[in-house]
Amino acid sequence: MTRHQKRLAVPNSWPVERKTNTFTVKAGAGPHGEAGVPLVVLLRDVLGYVDSTKEARYALNNDSVLVNGDAISDEQRPIGMFDILAFPERGEFFRVFPDEGGRLALTSVDEEAAGSRLGKITNKSVVPGGDAQLTLHDGTNVLVDADTEYDTKDSIVVDNESKDVVAHFEYEEGALVTAVAGQHAGRIGEVADIDVTLGSGSNTVFVGDDEDGYETVEEYLVVIDENFTGDDADEVDSDE
């Protein structure tokens, strides 16, 4: 199986320039599905820390790159929305956050903020033993007590070291959300109204106020809090 794909064919969320080289690295198996960006692309094309896949492999083999608190050895490992990228030797930490164009961007955060990651609950099920299993937007699972009140569309914050849930944000009117897809991707605001659609259609949500609000479908929204807006952080852009 090829390890490369044409740049023109990559998802719109990838932070790469499509009109330079013909090919780029293909994402390997892992979280985030097809939307995941290979780690080497962020290291090379966005941060400029390496010039080649070979240099990326060397850095990874020396445990100098952590993703959600774990050392990563595969340069093709998919990186996606709300992942935490840490470079302990450099003292640099980043959160993956969608920009207003819908492309994934790296937002600089401090070490404390880098100790946990946000996840949107996409499914909840009961597993043998009676615990509840929460499936997050990136495909990872978290076990919690069955009697805890977590619902799909809510968001949780997971500690990168203990893997425990340390915060819970309910999806409801008044919740702070960000759009992660569609024409309003990257925009942040409070849920003003949820218009429930009967049948299998998507619910429509109005975010913000009448003057500067927007309407989108429910699936495009993720509940966050003020610590995830990036208001006080610097965004790293790819070289284009």
From Swiss-Prot:
- Family statement drawn from the similarity comment of this UniProt entry: Belongs to the eukaryotic ribosomal protein eS4 family.
* Molecular function per GO: rRNA binding; structural constituent of ribosome
By its UniProt entry, which InterPro entries does this protein fall under?
Rib_uL2_dom2, Ribosomal_eS4, Ribosomal_eS4_central_region, Ribosomal_eS4_central_sf, Ribosomal_eS4_N, Ribosomal_eS4_N_CS, S4_RNA-bd_sf
* Stretches that traverse the bilayer: none
Native organism: Halorubrum lacusprofundi (strain ATCC 49239 / DSM 5036 / JCM 8891 / ACAM 34)
Record PANTHER family: 30S/40S RIBOSOMAL PROTEIN S4, SMALL RIBOSOMAL SUBUNIT PROTEIN ES4
The terms describing its cellular component in GO are:
cytosolic small ribosomal subunit
Q: What is the lineage of its organism?
A: Archaea, Methanobacteriati, Methanobacteriota, Stenosarchaea group, Halobacteria
Residue ranges of domain S4 RNA-binding in the record: 37-99
- Note whether rRNA-binding occurs among the keywords: yes
NCBIfam families given in the database record: PRK04313.1
Q: Under what name is this protein listed?
A: Small ribosomal subunit protein eS4
Q: Does the keyword Nucleus apply?
A: no
What biological processes does GO assign it?
A: translation
Q: Which UniProt keywords apply?
A: Ribonucleoprotein, Ribosomal protein, RNA-binding, rRNA-binding
